[in-house]
Amino acid sequence: MGKIVVSVIGAGGKMGTRTSNNLAKKPEEFDLLLVEASEAGIQSIKDRGFEPTPVEEALEKSDVVVFAVPDTLIGKLSAIYVPQLKPGTGFIILDPAAAVARELTLRDDCTFGVAHPCHPSYFLDQDTYEARQDRFGGCGGKQDIVMSKIQGNDDRFAQCVEVAKQMYAPVEHAYVMSSEQIAFLEPTLVELLGATCLYAMAETVDEAVKRGIPKEAAVSFLTGHIYNLSANFLGYIPGNPPVSDACKVAIGLGNRLVMREDWKKIWDDEVLNKVIATMLHPDKPQI
């Protein structure tokens, strides 16, 4: 099988830089074309030793296009670029929101997918010190990714999977599911709940410091317990030992004092749709 021709649109931005740097590491597998509109982005591409390609030329040559643009611009920009794709092209977006909100422009003769990183898990063994310091992924730290095929050809989507595994490399597993299921992972699982709780934990460290507790001690105590308790609750400790009776009481109190009684409604389809609409258009909140 020949090399896959991959264009990265938005290659001078944050995610465009990350993904294109990794794809460039495998020239024997990928012919890489970098597309960027902004002056700063073009300069960033040149500073990394590459040359930008005009978008018309890139789209004409591409087997797969990586659409590394901000989520809030996917609807607007896909309406410009998708009509220019050659028939049969694979088109990868990096977040499911625009697809779930039906703002992504589609074509019947092209294949569309979502590819999003899980980021390195603290339960995943890394091979080197440098890999353990990669908190985001894609810079040495192994991670999993999630993907969906929005529509299109299975063989072309298989190419999209290979592209995604390299642009987020090193990748352990690529879990394929629906775009809606990815959206329940983010924003519902990791942003509405996870990030909110973790932000509150960081604020709680500040409260500990106000009470004379050294910040280093509070951070160590908090993160150590997060590691231990998440291992316990998620089944990573052999035998699934129960937490202490006192901890169970504290969890019950926390559910009353910290969590809303109806917090699980964030898993309702209606809530998800309103959350996504608000995230894509914060000037028109739906919830």
UniProtKB/Swiss-Prot annotation:
The Gene Ontology terms for molecular function here are: metal ion binding; nucleotide binding; oxidoreductase activity
Which key words are in the record? Carbohydrate metabolism, Metal-binding, NAD, Nucleotide-binding, Oxidoreductase, Zinc
Keyword NAD applies: yes
Per UniProt, where does NAD(+) bind?
13-15, 36, 71
Q: Pfam families, per this entry?
A: KARI_N, PGDH_C
Pathway of action: Carbohydrate metabolism
**Membrane-traversing stretches:** none
Q: Which domain of life is it from?
A: Bacteria
The UniProt function text for this chain reads: Involved in catabolism of D-apiose. Catalyzes the conversion of D-apionate to 3-oxo-isoapionate.
What is this protein's record name?
D-apionate oxidoisomerase
Organism listed in the record = Blautia hydrogenotrophica (strain DSM 10507 / JCM 14656 / S5a33) (Ruminococcus hydrogenotrophicus)
Task: Supply the gene name.
Answer: apnO
